[in-house]
Amino acid sequence: MHQISEHLGDFDCWFSQLFPDTTFLKAIIKYTRLADGTVLANPLKNKSENYLQQHGLQIDYEGNKNRYDLVVFCTDMVVADKFKQTKTIWVQEGMIDKRTILTGIVKELGLPPYFSGDTSLNGSTNICDIYCTASEGYKNHFAANGTDPAKLIVTGIPNYDNQRQYLDNDFPFRNYVMVATTDMRETYRFENRPAFIKKAVKIANGRQMLFKLHPNERVDRAQAEIRKYAPAGTLVYHTGNTNHMIANCSELITQYSTVVYTGIALGKKVHSYFDVEELKKLSPIQNGGASAKNIARICKSYINFGGKKEKFLSQFTFQPEVTPYPEVQYA
């Protein structure tokens, strides 16, 4: 969102973390810990607010300070009623969780999409006016799951559209098998971490290993498990540039992490709990870092459109800026 706003200098941009818009959600946050692994609650809420403050961005939590001409979302699973008459654009921010039996039940019963307990319905509610997707594969995914195909525009997504830049780095290690973990336990999902570590060790087959922990993980627990089940000398990082680590690895093992797309874009051999061939179809387009600018162009055009919201897309022609990018040769 910050990158997109940098191309909207002629507009007065304000930012808000995701916020609860119903009594039910507010009660969940106040009386339970179910939202602790999300930006709805701390510590992630504070972390995102600190980012906004550090970069001098204007904050309007819950969007009450101004009347807005356009609202740009990165989730359509929680959209406040007060914005439903406003022009809205949804921007994909990363990987979408697998659909589960619960996803289907929530969808069929018309329950709020967050009842799925994951992001499997993000991008599939058809609430927003325009949907900016990472790739043609994701466009097809969202269309198949309920969003009007006419609303879907393949723009690429900031942070995942120029992965070759990470090949130029000063990370001191190379040619290791990298394991990027997911915060499943911190978000109340089941995980057998010892079994995952053992599987990664088997894949590495004696090669140097490097674990990069998810930022939300309990570091002490995760490190203790790695020390117990991985070979001596295994490298473990909780902080640092994940993309640089991926750029220098020989093979990447993930669970449900979006960073698998960095590995795919760089032609690495990757492992995931998702089907890898399907991930290659979904992988974000590489346009040399033009996604934020292209999304901002759509924002400008939509804000300046004086007709009815539903008439915009029928007269709009998307002309993306593209930087030539070499075709990826997969390992």
Tell me the role of every PLM-derived stretch.
Residues 78-80, 95-97, 183-191, 216-218, ...:
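Short acidic, S/G/P-rich loop/turn micro-motifs used as interaction or catalytic elements
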Residues 126-131, 208, 248-251:
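Short active-site oxyanion
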Residues 282-331:
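C-terminal amphipathic helix plus adjacent low-complexity
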